Amino acid sequence: MSHINHGRRKWLSLGGIVLGASLLPNTVLAAVSTPKPRLLSFRNINTGEKLSAEFALGRGFNNATLRLLDHLLRDKRTNQVHRMDPNLFTKFYQVQQNLGLRNTEIQIICGYRSATSNAAMHRRSRGVASNSYHIRGQAIDFRIDGIPLAKVRDAVDALQNGGVGFYPRSNFVHMDTGPVRTWRGS
């Protein structure tokens, strides 16, 4: 009789394990398929405006936040707003992860630049490209307070995705979504 009970216990235990295992994939799948919130915080040093928001929802972008970011990154000279490449924000998120940061304020030096503003800057400085990625909404000049500029540059460069300009005297890093390339400015 004890032999039968022992066998019955074994089958009941095995049934419990099988039942538990059948529930596990859904739990694991739910945990894996729910992405972490992708938060970014910005301060435009020219206007003093700040924005801290979730730029992506699930696997896509948060369009309401993208519109706010477009406004924050507008041309400081003309106040013109232009659609920024959302991939820039994914890159910012990856840069913060590379630096071991989480939702740390990113100081914006320059985002979108109208063709008029860019032409005026190009006339004053050889360092401004006549066909800058800023005109297309594909570039941002920035720094992260408290993080050495060279370390920020290295974190952007590690992505091997787009352009990286290093401007130590001007205290900013240029990041864009154009072809992979690097340069050093003043």
Q: Would you name each region that the model predicts?
A:
Residues 89-96, 118, 149, 153:
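Extracytoplasmic/secreted envelope proteins and their assembly/folding machinery
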Residues 2-3, 38-43, 127-186:
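Catalytic cores and adjacent binding grooves of peptidoglycan-active enzymes
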Residues 44-46, 55-57, 110-112, 144-146, ...:
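A mature extracytoplasmic/lumenal domain signature
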Residues 1-22:
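N-terminal secretory signal peptides and thylakoid transit peptides that target proteins
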Residues 51-56, 184-186:
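Short amphipathic beta-strand/extended segments with alternating polar/hydrophobic composition
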Residues 115-130:
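Charged, often glycine-rich, active-site loop that binds/positions anionic groups
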Residues 25-53:
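C-terminal segment of N-terminal export signals and the immediately downstream linker at the start
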Residues 58-109:
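Active-site acidic/histidine clusters and adjacent loop/turn architecture
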